[in-house]
C-alpha cells in the first residue's frame, strides 16, 4: 500500500529513525553524525545551509532535524517556519543548536516551531540522548 502511494518504506523496514543534521561547520556535522551512527538507530543525511535543509526535509522526510540556528543563507528560525508551514511535516521534530543563548531568541525559535534547544558547545552524547527523548525512543547501548 505504502509503496503504491509513493510513501518511502525504507526507514520503516529498517526500523531506523531518519535524521537530518544541518550545520555550516562540516567538522561539527561529522562529529554529530559519528555520534548518531554509534547509536545505530538512525538513517542520517546532512546539509550545510538553510536552503539544502529545506530541500532535505521535503525529500527525506526526517523524524528529527538537528538544526544550527546561524546558517550562511537562511537562518534556523526561518527553516523552522518553513517546516511548520507544511502540514505534511507536522510530525518532524526540530532540535536547534547554537552558540547564542539570549532567552528571547530561544523563545522565538520555540515559537517558530523548534521542539528543543541545546547550547554549543555540548557533548555529542547529550545531544543523542536529547534526540532520543524527543523521538520517545530508548538510547541503544551500542
Feature-to-residue mapping (PLM):
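A Lys-centered signature of the CheY-like receiver
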Residues: 120
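The feature encodes the CheY-like receiver
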Residues: 29, 72, 90, 102
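Active-site beta3 strand of CheY-like receiver
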Residues: 60-66, 71
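Two-component/phosphorelay signaling modules centered on CheY-like receiver
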Residues: 26-45
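Acidic catalytic/metal-coordinating carboxylates
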Residues: 49-52, 75-78
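Non-catalytic signal-transmission and effector/linker regions of two-component phosphorelay proteins
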Residues: 1-18, 125-142
Amino acid at each position: 500500500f505504502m509503496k503504491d502511494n509513493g510513501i518511502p518504506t525504507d526507514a520503516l523496514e529498517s526500523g531506523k529513525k531518519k535524521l537530518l543534521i544541518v550545520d555550516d561547520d562540516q567538522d561539527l556535522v561529522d562529529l554529530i553524525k559519528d555520534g548518531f551512527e554509534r547509536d545505530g538507530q538512525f538513517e542520517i543525511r546532512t546539509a550545510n545551509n538553510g536552503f539544502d535543509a529545506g530541500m532535505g526535509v521535503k525529500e527525506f522526510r526526517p523524524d528529527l532535524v538537528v538544526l544550527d540556528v546561524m546558517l550562511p543563507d537562511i537562518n534556523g528560525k526561518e527553516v523552522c517556519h518553513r517546516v511548520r508551514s507544511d502540514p505534511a511535516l507536522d510530525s518532524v521534530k526540530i532540535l536547534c543548536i547554537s552558540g547564542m543563548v539570549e532567552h528571547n531568541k530561544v523563545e522565538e525559535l520555540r515559537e517558530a516551531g523548534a521542539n528543543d534547544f541545546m547550547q554549543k558547545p555540548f557533548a555529542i552524547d547529550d545531544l543523542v540522548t536529547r534526540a532520543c527523548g524527543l523521538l520517545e525512543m530508548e538510547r541503544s547501548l551500542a
